[in-house]
């Protein structure tokens, strides 16, 4: 079974079994919704158990979650630095033009058929996502995911076509 990373447990929150999660999912409200099932993986990326979300709320830069049946800090403190993953079969179908992060990360980025690099990470700083493009011999390029910049995405070909506005890439 394939699993996709949706968050990392970075700490406990209070004494009632809540955990601070650093989310790496594109649909946190949906992914951490009460009743949803996730898989827990240890620091060595080994499957530990399936868990069910009992509660979820946002707090600053974290998602605060609680697992069903684990209502005290003693139940969950051993999960610090563990990963939360979703099974591939639990991913919802997306509309045309929508993509999961795991589909975008690893794609090659081209401008005018010239390879710029590979998407290595997706940041969520505010209004739109920012793709971090790893380039050979240059600093990473921070590419906003907005229509004037991203011209096309072809998952099957592993390719993204872009037009970089003047001033966005200071290494050219």
From Swiss-Prot:
Classification via SUPFAM superfamilies: PRC-barrel domain, Translation proteins
Gene Ontology MF terms in the entry: ribosome binding
Example of a GO biological process term: ribosomal small subunit biogenesis
InterPro entries: PRC-brl_dom (IPR027275), PRC_barrel-like_sf (IPR011033), RimM (IPR011961), RimM_N (IPR002676), RimM_N_sf (IPR036976), Transl_B-barrel_sf (IPR009000)
Keyword flag Transferase: no
Bilayer-spanning residue ranges: none
Gene Ontology CC: one annotated term: ribosome
Functional summary from the UniProt entry: An accessory protein needed during the final step in the assembly of 30S ribosomal subunit, possibly for assembly of the head region. Essential for efficient processing of 16S rRNA. May be needed both before and after RbfA during the maturation of 16S rRNA. It has affinity for free ribosomal 30S subunits but not for 70S ribosomes.
Record remark: domains: The PRC barrel domain binds ribosomal protein uS19.
PANTHER family, sorted: RIBOSOME MATURATION FACTOR RIMM (PTHR33692:SF1)
Name this protein carries in UniProt: Ribosome maturation factor RimM
Biological source species: Streptococcus sanguinis (strain SK36)
């Amino acid at each position: 079974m394939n699993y996709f990373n949706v968050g990392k447990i970075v700490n406990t929150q209070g004494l009632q079994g809540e955990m601070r999660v650093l989310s790496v999912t594109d649909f946190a409200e949906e992914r951490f919704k009460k009743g949803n099932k996730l898989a827990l993986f240890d620091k060595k990326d080994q499957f530990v158990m399936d868990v069910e979300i009992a509660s979820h709320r946002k707090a600053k830069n974290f998602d605060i979650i609680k697992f069903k049946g684990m209502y005290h800090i003693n139940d969950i403190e051993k999960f610090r630095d563990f990963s939360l993953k979703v099974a591939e079969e639990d991913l919802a179908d997306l509309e045309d033009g929508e993509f999961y992060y795991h589909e975008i990360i690893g794609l090659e980025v081209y401008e005018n058929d010239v390879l710029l690099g590979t998407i290595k990470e997706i940041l969520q700083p505010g209004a739109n996502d920012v793709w971090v493009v790893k380039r050979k011999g240059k600093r990473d390029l921070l590419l906003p995911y907005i229509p004037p910049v991203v011209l096309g995405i072809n998952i099957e070909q592993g390719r993204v076509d872009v037009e970089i506005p003047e001033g966005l890439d200071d290494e050219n």
